[in-house]
Amino acid sequence: MTATLLTAEQLSSVAEKLPGWTLADQRLRRQWRFRNFVEAFGFMTRVALLAEAMNHHPEWSNVYATVTIELTTHDVNGLSDRDLKLAEAINLLEPG
């Protein structure tokens, strides 16, 4: 699937379309805090399966109960429509 670099207009509306995500340096970033490591790892597992199905993979880190995800598309050197779709799908996985 070919990625399309987002326009300046599309970038300006990212915050309202993606609650919880921040935009900086051509990356979308979001952090989650869970009650414990098992919950954090369970969330990461669900995201991993989703990312694999979408063939678009996040940059992420996990420290105990905190998961941080950053999205960017290296092929276009910035944010693409694929990043938006993955962020929207990840938001649907949120607990609670």
UniProtKB/Swiss-Prot annotation:
Keywords: Lyase. The keyword Lyase applies. One of its GO terms (molecular function) is 4-alpha-hydroxytetrahydrobiopterin dehydratase activity. Pfam families: Pterin_4a. SUPFAM superfamilies: PCD-like. One of its GO terms (biological process) is tetrahydrobiopterin biosynthetic process. The keyword Lyase applies. InterPro entries: PCD_sf, Pterin_deHydtase. It catalyses: (4aS,6R)-4a-hydroxy-L-erythro-5,6,7,8-tetrahydrobiopterin = (6R)-L-erythro-6,7-dihydrobiopterin + H2O. Its EC number is 4.2.1.96. Belongs to the pterin-4-alpha-carbinolamine dehydratase family. NCBIfam families: PRK00823.1-2, PRK00823.1-3. This is Putative pterin-4-alpha-carbinolamine dehydratase. It comes from Prochlorococcus marinus (strain MIT 9303). The lineage of its organism: Bacteria, Bacillati, Cyanobacteriota, Cyanophyceae, Synechococcales.
